[in-house]
């Protein structure tokens, strides 16, 4: 069990596929720290059992009869706020529905990529356990709020003094790198939505997503923000007011080419040392090198410690760093690693980060 976990994590599984119910249940019940307290075959039964059983976490399919997963999620969040992990298909339509679910309050998602392939089944099992345990770290750390992640406007926590006052950092960089994981899709929209379209610097983003999701996600952000936002392609040049999102399933590196900074996309085989894909560490490290430290690094909510090494390298080259605070992080892992590792110049609640990026870059 986790350090602060005093009992088993109680999970409700909601899925209309008997095969998926069996797979999810068998994976979770093999872990002694997890208890599957209920099974529901559609969204309506899922809402009923959520109210009756009050689980710590719900795994929720999206496409179901009687009541779909997003409608069920909205009812759960209205009646008994619970952490919900969406189980979605690896398609463009599945991606769009997943982002709707995240907007409605789901904390994360897992692609439904269970085929006859032994490798695919292994990846699904590992990803499911990793995300459920990541949710557990927040469940046993603090209570669930009644609002979706987008609406988290918690008062700033008392944070350690920043090593460098933010007023002294303005105008010290020409590029921005942002990394995130769990809770990141909604958090990133909040951050980018507060940066004006005429922002004078280029922005690169690495967020842990599968291949089929980053394109629709970039399109979604582009429709909601003033900045121009697109999925990055190999050879793209970083330009002012443009946000390049690392393509899912690959790593993004930055390299200097003459007077420009260009994108290089790499396969997982070319960067086997990274667990998370796309790697925030690799993006931040190469951004620091390509810009000789003339960059602002930002770490948002997410599990694990991806981004810490990259932020540390950026700081060693004179770069600037901002990290999301604990109170507004869906999962505090990535921010915690940076803060406790001493690589955060400034620690801010989510709703202040975008404005600070805009102010410093103005």
Swiss-Prot record:
Active site, per annotation: 181, 208, 306
EC number: 3.1.1.61, 3.5.1.44
GO BP, one annotated term: chemotaxis
Localisation: Cytoplasm
Catalytic reaction annotation: [protein]-L-glutamate 5-O-methyl ester + H2O = L-glutamyl-[protein] + methanol + H(+); L-glutaminyl-[protein] + H2O = L-glutamyl-[protein] + NH4(+)
Residues annotated as domain CheB-type methylesterase: 163-357
Location of 4-aspartylphosphate modifications: 61
GO terms of molecular function: phosphorelay response regulator activity; protein-glutamate methylesterase activity; protein-glutamine glutaminase activity
Top EC class of this enzyme: hydrolase
Post-translational modification: Phosphorylated by CheA. Phosphorylation of the N-terminal regulatory domain activates the methylesterase activity.
Keywords: Chemotaxis, Cytoplasm, Hydrolase, Phosphoprotein
Ranges of residues in domain Response regulatory: 10-127
Keyword Cytoplasm attributed: yes
Listed GO CC annotations: cytoplasm
Entry-linked HAMAP family: CheB_chemtxs
Annotated function: Involved in chemotaxis. Part of a chemotaxis signal transduction system that modulates chemotaxis in response to various stimuli. Catalyzes the demethylation of specific methylglutamate residues introduced into the chemoreceptors (methyl-accepting chemotaxis proteins or MCP) by CheR. Also mediates the irreversible deamidation of specific glutamine residues to glutamic acid.
Domain text: Contains a C-terminal catalytic domain, and an N-terminal region which modulates catalytic activity.
Family, as annotated: Belongs to the CheB family.
Protein name according to UniProt: Protein-glutamate methylesterase/protein-glutamine glutaminase 1
Source organism per UniProt: Geobacter sulfurreducens (strain ATCC 51573 / DSM 12127 / PCA)
């Amino acid at each position: 069990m986790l350090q602060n976990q005093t009992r088993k994590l109680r999970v409700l599984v909601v899925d209309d596929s008997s095969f998926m119910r069996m797979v999810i249940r068998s994976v979770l019940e093999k872990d002694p720290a997890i208890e599957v307290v209920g099974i529901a075959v559609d969204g309506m039964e899922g809402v009923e059992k959520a109210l009756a059983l009050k689980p710590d976490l719900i795994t929720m399919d999206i496409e179901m009869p009687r009541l779909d997963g997003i409608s069920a999620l909205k009812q759960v969040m209205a009646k008994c706020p619970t952490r919900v992990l969406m189980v979605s298909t690896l398609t463009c339509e599945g991606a769009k529905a997943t982002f709707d679910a995240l907007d409605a309050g789901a904390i994360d998602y897992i692609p439904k990529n269970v085929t006859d392939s032994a490798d695919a089944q292994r990846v699904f099992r590992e990803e499911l356990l990793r995300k459920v345990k990541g949710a557990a770290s927040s469940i046993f750390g603090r209570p669930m709020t009644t609002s979706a992640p987008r609406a988290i406007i918690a008062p700033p926590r008392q944070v350690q003094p920043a090593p460098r006052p933010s007023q002294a950092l303005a105008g010290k960089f020409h590029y921005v790198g942002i990394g995130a994981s769990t809770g990141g899709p909604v958090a990133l929209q909040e951050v980018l939505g507060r940066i004006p379209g005429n922002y004078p610097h280029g922005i690169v983003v690495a967020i842990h997503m599968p291949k089929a999701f980053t394109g629709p996600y970039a399109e979604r952000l582009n429709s909601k923000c003033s900045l121009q936002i697109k999925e990055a392609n190999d050879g793209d040049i970083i330009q002012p007011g443009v946000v390049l999102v690392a393509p899912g399933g690959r790593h993004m590196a930055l390299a200097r080419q003459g007077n420009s900074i260009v994108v290089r996309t790499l396969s997982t085989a070319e960067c086997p040392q990274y667990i998370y894909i796309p790697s925030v560490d690799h993006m931040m490290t190469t951004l620091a090198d390509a810009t000789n430290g003339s960059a602002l690094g930002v770490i948002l909510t997410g599990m694990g410690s991806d981004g810490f090494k990259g932020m540390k390298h950026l700081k060693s080259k004179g770069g600037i760093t901002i990290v999301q605070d604990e109170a507004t992080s869906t999962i505090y892992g990535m921010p915690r690693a940076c803060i406790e590792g001493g690589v955060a110049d400034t620690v801010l609640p989510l709703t202040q980060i975008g404005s600070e990026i805009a102010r410093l870059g103005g």
